[in-house]
Amino acid sequence: MMAAISAAEHGADVVLFEKNDRFGKKLRITGKGRCNLTNDCDQKEFLGNVPTNPRFLYAALSGFSTEDTKSFFENLGVPLKTERGKRVFPVSDKAQDIVHAMERHCRDCGVQMIREKVKSVVIRDGIAVGIQTESQALEADAVIVCTGGLSYPTTGSDGDGYRFARAAGHRVTELQPSLIPLVAEGKLCASMQGLSLKNVSLRMVDCETGKCVYEDFGEMLFTHYGLSGPMVLSASAHLKDITPGKYQAQIDLKPALDEKKLDARLLSDFAKYQNKDFANSLGDLLPQKMIEPFIRLCEIDPRKKVNSITREERERIVRQMKRLCVEIRGVRPISEAIITRGGVDVKEISPKTMESKLVSGLYFAGEVLDLDAYTGGFNLQIAFSTAYAAGEAAACQTPRTENQ
């Protein structure tokens, strides 16, 4: 929709095709239905959150910045707010407000909106001249492909854009899931299924090199298959070629306390509960759902009285609290990823216009390109910026008739 709006605002006659039963289906579920539409940071910080081809985005971000995105939606009557991590949301916390505003603006700009699947892009003599749908052929001076990647295929992102790109002679880099939950070895995570942790630290360690590849403080979630939550999704973007045994998640349950202070806290709690079983002495330090599996990790009899806990056992408890280790086996299916890593090779795309360097009049924007970023509104901003650039450039194609 952003590409259609941009093209229409720059004077083009625009036809927008959507194969789903409604427009903005994927946008409606972003940010757990709240729509984290951008990040209120400067360009340097923004590009620091783009691990794949950040330099390609300089021109697009300069042409339609995070400030431009905020102004765009506020001018459409959607008040915004900024939360922790500079994440920008609609005040209503409803993604549908963003979708409805864009739909209204499309119609106000004269965009013809058609719900029909596009089967192919028609190319003649190296020029995009239209599209073929299931029921009609439409001539056009420019075609913009904004089909998304492979994540959330039920929203329509099932790889059509990659098929169009390959048919046009473009290289599509390896497609992998990113911003995706992690699958763990063993039954530890399943035993704590549904438990959400806040104010913990997470380190992801490459077991082959011993190097920490990701570290952050925040929230995470144990699931029946492994780990999820904001930090885990962000961590997944830093992991390459995930195989069993390659990565280990290390969770610091008490990051505000060093080992000495945590030991002192344990001694204080043990004095408080000196006549209780070990299993009944950890309630002030750990969530109830974690206590039983945690005790198993410590290899201490849960019925042992706390006044009988040895110094060596106490050290074992402290070590587990400061470094709870989870071996990573893999990731969830790409259909569960927030975004797709990989896509149309940006070396074959003009960074200023998003036009194909191989086919005149053919443009690509958004997740279909080999661009991905961390969580925090960065990926939607990439979609908005590249779509705006593509729409503006497509509107300048001459002679001008209809643009998709």
Predicted features, each with a name:
Residues M1-L16, F384-A395:
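N-terminal Rossmann-like FAD-binding beta1-loop-alpha1 element of flavoenzymes
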Residues V15-F17, V118, I131, L138-S157, ...:
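Short hydrophobic core segments
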Residues R28-A60:
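N-terminal glycine-rich dinucleotide-binding loop that anchors FAD/FMN and/or NAD(P) in oxidoreductases
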Residues A60-A142, I291:
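Feature captures the FAD/FMN-dependent oxidoreductase FAD-binding
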Residues A8-K32:
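Glycine-rich FAD pyrophosphate-binding loop
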Residues G149-A168, D370-P399:
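A conserved FAD-binding loop/helix module that cradles the flavin
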Residues I114-S120, E292-D372:
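A glycine-rich dinucleotide-binding beta-alpha-beta segment and adjacent secondary-structure elements
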Residues D21-I29, L37, Q43-K44, P79, ...:
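An anion/pyrophosphate-binding glycine-rich loop and adjacent beta-alpha core
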